A protein has these predicted regions:
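Transmembrane-helix signature of 12-pass secondary carriers
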Residues: 1-307
């Protein structure tokens, strides 16, 4: 019983901590942007790629120490003895109940992922245009302009993820108190409204201080609901499979968003205003996510489903 009560808060906290890496990246990027020169003639983005590779090496040692939970090991052994296949995409996509949950959740998740990965994470393009305009009056040289833009783009990432951390914690908490579907709907609505705010109205660097945290709150807050809700839609034999399907296929679908934004931008003249408008049009997909939520079950205060 204690594990059941703690599961949702723990998942929400774990998901929110994912922003810490982005916060660190933003702070490091700001430091690189402030540096007068970089070693080996590196450009700011090249230095960030090198720094970003280090955690991947660290994760190898961490993963080597992680072990499967004993409860999962026992459940898998018991399931296999009964002939239950674990991790079967065939079972996931052909079972009447689980396939229904998988497909509708995929649509809802894809909407939120497109909002972040396909639209919101391209806010540095807007930041760059703002910084260029404000820095032109200062007669900065080419290298100075590059460092200035790198600083503010990294600052934007920092602001976004401060809001994202709070958003994930808040939406995960609301999912526990209001219910999964109401929290999901609110998170998608916040994502949509905050995207409109940034893409239409962010025009000065001072706007970044409050608009980007709001966008991070909305767009990343959706992921706090994913962490709590998705595992509750599938049985033990398909829990990670179903969650992975909804999230990772959603990421593949989100990969089409930048191409769509690019095409719309080109149709609208190819300038920054065209890009802003394109982002606004594509953000309408977030409303589709809200529209399909009634097709999914409410799982608040329900035991995890089983075969």
């Amino acid at each position: 019983m204690r594990c059941r009560i703690a599961r949702a808060p723990a998942l929400g906290l774990l998901q929110s901590i994912s922003t810490w890496g982005n916060l660190a990246a933003g702070a490091i990027g700001m430091g690189i942007g402030l540096a007068a020169t970089l070693p080996f003639g590196l450009k700011p983005w090249q230095a960030m790629f090198i720094v970003g590779a280090l955690p991947a090496l660290m994760s190898v040692f961490v993963l080597a120490k992680l072990k499967e939970p004993q409860k999962w090991v026992d459940a898998r052994a018991a399931g296999l003895a009964k002939g239950i296949k674990f991790g079967s995409y065939k079972n996931l996509l052909t079972h009447p109940r689980w396939s229904r949950n998988a497909w509708w959740a995929l649509i809802a998740c894809s909407a939120g992922i497109i909002g972040l990965w396909g639209i919101g994470n391209f806010h540095p393009k807007i930041v760059g245009s703002i910084v260029e305009g404000e820095a032109a009056a200062r007669n900065l040289t080419g290298p100075e302009m590059a460092s200035h833009k790198a600083f503010w783009r990294s600052a934007g990432l920092l602001f976004q993820n401060i809001g994202g951390f709070i958003g994930m914690l808040s939406m995960a908490k609301l999912a526990q108190t209001w219910g999964r579907r109401p929290a999901f709907a609110l998170a998608l609505l916040c994502s949509f409204l905050s995207t409109v705010l940034v893409f239409k109205f962010m025009r000065q660097t001072t706007d970044m201080y409050w608009m980007l945290p709001l966008m991070g709150f909305g767009q990343l807050g959706v992921f706090g609901v994913y962490a709590v809700y998705l595992p509750e839609l599938f049985p033990t034999s398909l829990r990670s499979t179903g969650t992975s399907f909804c999230y990772n296929v959603g990421r593949l679908l989100a990969a089409t968003a930048p191409f769509t934004v690019s095409k719309i931008t080109a149709k609208l003249g190819g300038d920054i205003e065209g890009f802003r408008t394109a982002g606004l049009w594509v953000s309408l997909v977030l409303l589709l996510g809200i529209a399909v939520l009634p097709m999914l079950p409410e799982t608040k205060d329900q035991p995890l489903p089983e075969e």
